[in-house]
Amino acid sequence: MCEKIQKILARHGYGSRRYIESLIKSHSVKINDEVVKVGQRISINVIQKVIINNNNYKPKLNINKSLKVLLYNKPEGEICTRKDQRNRRTIFEKLPKLSNARWINIGRLDLNSSGLLLFTTDGELAYRLTHPSFNIERIYKVRVFGQFTENILKQLNVRVKLLDGYANFKSIQFKYGEGKNKWFNVSLCEGRHRIVRRIWEKLGFQVNKLVRISYAHLTLPKTLFPGTWITLNKHDIDVLCKKVNLR
């Protein structure tokens, strides 16, 4: 069976589908010594040689049999990139080393946000878990500064217009707080850049603390300290895969 090249390479651990597509567009990917195009289809059985950015790789066609997923408690101050020109700490520095694969982050958290961040060796799984069409829920605990009124609280469940389209919280729950600083739990089924902060800012509030506490069916363990991680068991990995039709 022939599949799109970017999908095959993502599934077998060469990177996320978006990352691979960007490399293909820049003519940086060769299969069997031929430059490939976005959307080009091929049978996995004929792949003998993979070249990415002039680096020669042996085909890792069985890597998905040892699919791994990590749950990491990201601390504030770490940036979601592999290398940073300003030499800031990155989310990959504390992860366990892999000999025949690479960790791919499932979504992002900005520099000043913390909490649950998933990593996988399967680029297709990462792609699907972040794509809005699969409606994967994320829950955040946020501390918000501002003057609250009954009218404002009602608006929090209404769609607001941002520069890149409309957005709204799937649910919002007041937790605690007095004065102008209050804690809420909010949920969404998308992960646009700084989307939680931008919704609040549109309504005239400032988020001064943001922690992701849940992604899909997974919750951030209270015993998992910032900067540490746990490996998901087979059951949790299977549940993730089923949510995005990979099982």
Curated annotation (Swiss-Prot):
Pfam families reported for this sequence: PseudoU_synth_2, S4
Gene3D superfamilies in the cross-refs: Alpha-L RNA-binding motif, Pseudouridine synthase I, catalytic domain, N-terminal subdomain, RNA-binding S4 domain
Every S4 RNA-binding domain range: 3-73
Enzyme Commission code: 5.4.99.22
GO MF annotations, alphabetized: 23S rRNA pseudouridine(2605) synthase activity; RNA binding
Catalytic activity: uridine(2605) in 23S rRNA = pseudouridine(2605) in 23S rRNA
One example of a Gene Ontology biological process annotation: enzyme-directed rRNA pseudouridine synthesis
Keywords: Isomerase, RNA-binding, rRNA processing
InterPro entries reported in the protein's UniProt record: PsdUridine_s_RsuA/RluB/E/F_cat (IPR042092), PsdUridine_synth_cat_dom_sf (IPR020103), PsdUridine_synth_RsuA/RluA (IPR006145), PsdUridine_synth_RsuA/RluB/E/F (IPR000748), PsdUridine_synth_RsuA/RluB_CS (IPR018496), RsuA_PseudoU_synthase (IPR050343), S4_RNA-bd (IPR002942), S4_RNA-bd_sf (IPR036986)
Source taxon at top rank: Bacteria
Active site: 110 (nucleophile)
EC class: isomerase
Family per similarity comment: Belongs to the pseudouridine synthase RsuA family.
NCBIfam families: pseudouridine synthase
Function statement: Responsible for synthesis of pseudouridine from uracil-2605 in 23S ribosomal RNA.
Protein name: Ribosomal large subunit pseudouridine synthase B
Organism of derivation: Buchnera aphidicola subsp. Baizongia pistaciae (strain Bp)
